[in-house]
Design a protein with these regions (language model features):
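Exposed aromatic-hydrophobic patches
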Residues: 23-28, 78-86
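Aromatic, loop-rich ligand-recognition surfaces of beta-strand-rich domains
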Residues: 25-49, 108-112
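Noncatalytic modules at the cell exterior or secretory-pathway interfaces
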Residues: 33-40, 85-103
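Transition segment at domain starts
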Residues: 1-33
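Short, surface-exposed beta-strand/strand-loop-strand elements in extracellular ectodomains
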Residues: 46-60
């Protein structure tokens, strides 16, 4: 049986600043998904930056979140990167681990189940 898309939404718009955080994906979003895909879109004019996908045990956690893989580093302007996470995560977000230079980044989330 083919996976069905459970949701698609933009979780960060025009991110630039170091440590800027996306909207959180919570159990309400992730409860019915088997796979989460994040599309990280470095905009035109960008020349540097990095995005770290992270998870935590509760929404709004103020400590250091657990990294989900390595940071996604800028490679080219107007380029899309995809990060896929299989299995359960309670709360997930993206954080700019290196400020975006020369433009901004948008991040979209897709939940499949």
């Amino acid at each position: 049986m083919a996976a069905r898309m459970r949701f698609f939404r933009k979780i960060m718009s025009a991110g630039v600043a170091l440590d800027a955080k996306s909207d959180e994906l919570t159990p309400a979003d992730l409860g019915s998904v088997d796979e989460l895909a994040l599309y990280i879109v470095f905009g035109p004019g960008t020349s540097a930056g990095s995005v770290q996908v992270e998870s935590a045990h509760v929404s709004g956690y103020t400590g250091v979140w657990a990294p989900e893989g390595s940071p996604v580093a800028w490679a080219a302007a107007s380029r899309v990167h995809k990060v896929s996470i299989a299995g359960a995560s309670f709360v997930t977000r993206a954080r700019l681990s290196v400020a975006i230079v020369g433009g901004s980044v948008d991040i979209y989330a897709v939940g499949n189940g």
